Amino acid sequence: MSFTTKVKEELIHLSTGDNNELAAIIKLSGSLGLAHQSLHLSITTENAKIARYIYSLIEDAYVIVPEIRYHQKTNLRKNRVYTVYVEQGVETILADLKLADSFFGLETGIEPQVLSDDNAGRSYLKGAFLAAGSIRDPESGKYQLEIYSVYLDHAQDLAQLMQKFMLDAKTIEHKSGAVTYLQKAEDIMDFLIIIGAMSCKEDFEAIKLLREARNDINRANNAETANIAKTISASMKTINNIIKIMDTIGLESLPIELQQVAQLRVKHPDYSIQQVADALEFPITKSGVNHRLRKINKIADDL
């Protein structure tokens, strides 16, 4: 499973979305058609779970029963494309979500109310990422989050919305549309917090810290950095075990004194045992830290 899919599947298991989220989804992955002298709405995705989620959003908000259709792509990947198809009440949905203008070429940006309200903005960003977002796997060490828009003004509004949350968002125009993107790891982690993907944020941070620890070891090519590398190397097993605990039973399942040591070890892989001991809220001895780290390793080994 890609990291993008992991984030999206976490998002759809959060509490039910709202109209701002649905508006973003429709604007970024929806299209209108005319059949039997009435409008129909099609929302496409390559993820079956997201299709079911969109289905539920529409059904719950408008007491309308959409239809889910699918077809097979003809390219080499042969992915299925799922379409949430709405025949009834389309005009009501468009009017309620203030989307009609965007489909008829009069307005393609983001509603001012969404740009001015924090909660509405968070919901809109969540929907935008579900519909057209992607994150490069943090294991690659090259950090990038992108959201594709058909229209440049929408991409620019999206960047403005992200900037409101203190994110260094930028846009770039392509022949087929425009992309709003983030390239700083800290901005990507903050974005994940904003849209509610807390578990994936923790995973992203753990991978980033582990990569940085490995890079520190690789750069340890002189006497001064060799000592740091030795400390980091000794902590790698513990860091991997802490990540194992986070991914299985969760760090919160540990006693508070073990949680504190675990958080410090992951956050500061280059710290010596003494530095970890000194950094605790209530400092303890080196032997006390070693004792807690051994407990953490044993818990991970028993999983």
Curated annotation (Swiss-Prot):
Gene3D superfamilies on file: Homing endonucleases
InterPro entries from the UniProt entry: Homing_endonucl (IPR027434), Sporu_reg_WhiA_N_dom (IPR018478), Sporulation_regulator_WhiA (IPR003802), Sporulation_regulator_WhiA_C (IPR023054), WhiA_LAGLIDADG_dom (IPR039518)
DNA-binding region of this protein: 272-303
Domain of life: Bacteria
SUPFAM superfamilies: Homing endonucleases
UniProtKB keywords: Cell cycle, Cell division, DNA-binding
Molecular-function annotations in GO: DNA binding
Single GO BP term: cell division
Family under the similarity heading: Belongs to the WhiA family.
PANTHER family with a match to the protein in the record: CELL DIVISION PROTEIN WHIA-RELATED
Reported function: Involved in cell division and chromosome segregation.
HAMAP family for the chain: HTH_type_WhiA (MF_01420)
Protein name, per record: Probable cell division protein WhiA
